[in-house]
Regions:
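N-terminal phosphate-binding or glycine-rich loops at protein starts, especially the Walker A/P-loop
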Residues: 1-44
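Solvent-exposed alpha-helices and their adjacent loops that cap or buttress functional pockets
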Residues: 4, 26, 57-61, 88-92, ...
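Short Gly/Thr/Asp-enriched flexible loops that form oxyanion-binding sites at enzyme active sites
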Residues: 17-22, 103-117
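Glycine-rich oxoanion-binding loops at beta->alpha junctions
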Residues: 43-99, 104-105, 137-151
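Polyanion-binding loop/helix "lid" in catalytic or ligand-binding cores
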Residues: 147-169
């Protein structure tokens, strides 16, 4: 079996760890893994390549997504774009797809699944707005970062005897 992995949309902390975990699970089952570079945009450009275990080793500590991310209006708005994406994945030998991303990314994965390509969605968004999930990848880090920044601003506000307003998202 050969699966492809794609990261798309806005990035969230932990996306690379999710990518590595998906690939490691596939390898443990004896499957091959393909990486789709630059999200749905890269998928429609045919940017699909094999991944080996050694490549994944350093991914966990890196921010962002090592595969890149990109949106595609052709994919989002046209049925032909989705059909072309499936054709490219199948030409590369992929029998399934793992999509790591937020709501729009997972909607794209659902569309591919409905067109016959088995697809798994991994929710990764700091917005934590994916229906049916309690926490998505990235939200804990985002909230802890906000709390840390607010603690620092509080010290500054106290020193200047001022109130501060912090807007998040």
């Amino acid at each position: 079996l050969k699966i492809a992995v794609l990261t798309s949309g806005g990035i969230a902390p932990g996306v690379n760890a999710a990518l590595r975990a998906a690939a490691q699970e596939a390898f443990s089952r004896g499957w091959e893994v393909l990486a789709v570079e630059e999200g749905y945009y890269g998928l429609l450009e045919g940017e699909i390549r094999p991944v080996d275990r050694a490549e994944l080793w350093g991914y966990v500590q890196l921010g962002g997504t090592v595969l890149g991310t990109g949106r595609s209006s052709e994919f989002e708005e046209k049925e032909e774009g989705k059909e072309w994406a499936i054709e490219l994945l199948r030409d590369a030998g992929a029998e399934g797809l793992v999509v790591i991303g937020g709501g729009g990314s997972l909607s794209g994965g659902l569309a591919l699944d409905e067109l016959g390509l088995p697809t798994v969605g991994v929710p990764a968004t700091i917005d934590n707005d994916i229906l049916g999930t309690e926490l998505s990848i990235g939200v804990d880090t985002a909230l802890n970062t906000v709390a840390e920044v607010i603690d620092r601003i509080k010290d500054t506000a106290t020193s200047h005897r001022r109130a501060m307003v912090v807007e998040v998202l």
